[in-house]
């Protein structure tokens, strides 16, 4: 069995993808242009959404959608603390209050039973998070939003390739997908906004490029329209072609990528049943198709004899990468020290979030792995846990 370093992740890039990037470099048009437009069309075909806007990151998209919805001082936005901190940062930077909702103890996603008690007259938005490649139970969450007249924006950073009740995430509602380097499909850095709302899409497209009345690339004139004027002050959040082209080939292979990740993840799950104190996340029982963005386990220190951080350090000694997705937002230094002074008392019951934040560990998972790599990781964990 190889002892070469096995990283936590590696992008699913092949030689054709590399050649496509080189073609863009040779073309003379490397910023936002035809390849960004092609990527948007590819996302539309895959998801079935009505509108797609390519962006420099999903975080940029979150900033813009919060702005368009008018989120600001005095408003509350309900979102999990068990997520990457970008959403919470954007809410905070706009002067609104992030209201942290707890998650299910075993799949680490929130639901209506946890969200509804947190709704107040100040609640202006709900941002639930698809987690690790599994889908939220969307119908119930959208029904809740409609009942209270509160919009829902899906944080779908982990969910490109995931399905809910037979339809790709993005088919309905409004979503933000991440195309960061660690994601199942990557542009190195980037994100995609999808929606069924034409007016919302038009605002996002305008705001992402200085507030101009055209995109960075005018698709009819094959270049920037010289008469373009600023309709409203905007930002510089467009995705360049040199990034967009990288994902085009991956989007053609997304079914293959998802299938390989699924096979590897299920092999992990089979083998880990024999390792005491190590528990993978549960798979939700409602109808959905997991795209296995992450392979997450929980490390029970009482059974394993060591904690999560110690396991990660020991795996590193075995030339195996591992990570944490995520340290709960409300436990991060800034929010630990400033939340109460800025926003008042934090949500009282975040028990499942806090418990899992101390135990979760992400194991290597990427399409270039094989079953022997999975077996190597599980064997290392078993030996570490057995030897304490």
UniProtKB/Swiss-Prot annotation:
GO terms, molecular function: pyridoxal phosphate binding; UDP-4-amino-4-deoxy-L-arabinose aminotransferase
Any one Gene Ontology cellular component term annotated for this protein: membrane
Entry-linked SUPFAM superfamilies: PLP-dependent transferases
Modified residues (N6-(pyridoxal phosphate)lysine): 183
Top enzyme category: transferase
Superkingdom of origin organism: Bacteria
Disulfide-linked positions: none
Pfam families per the UniProt record, alphabetical: DegT_DnrJ_EryC1 (PF01041)
Transmembrane domains' residue ranges: none
Pathway in which this enzyme or protein is active: Nucleotide-sugar biosynthesis; UDP-4-deoxy-4-formamido-beta-L-arabinose biosynthesis; UDP-4-deoxy-4-formamido-beta-L-arabinose from UDP-alpha-D-glucuronate: step 2/3; Bacterial outer membrane biogenesis; lipopolysaccharide biosynthesis
Catalytic activity: UDP-4-amino-4-deoxy-beta-L-arabinose + 2-oxoglutarate = UDP-beta-L-threo-pentopyranos-4-ulose + L-glutamate
Chain's role: Catalyzes the conversion of UDP-4-keto-arabinose (UDP-Ara4O) to UDP-4-amino-4-deoxy-L-arabinose (UDP-L-Ara4N). The modified arabinose is attached to lipid A and is required for resistance to polymyxin and cationic antimicrobial peptides.
Quaternary structure, from the entry: Homodimer.
UniProt name for this protein: UDP-4-amino-4-deoxy-L-arabinose--oxoglutarate aminotransferase
Native source organism of the sequence: Shewanella sediminis (strain HAW-EB3)
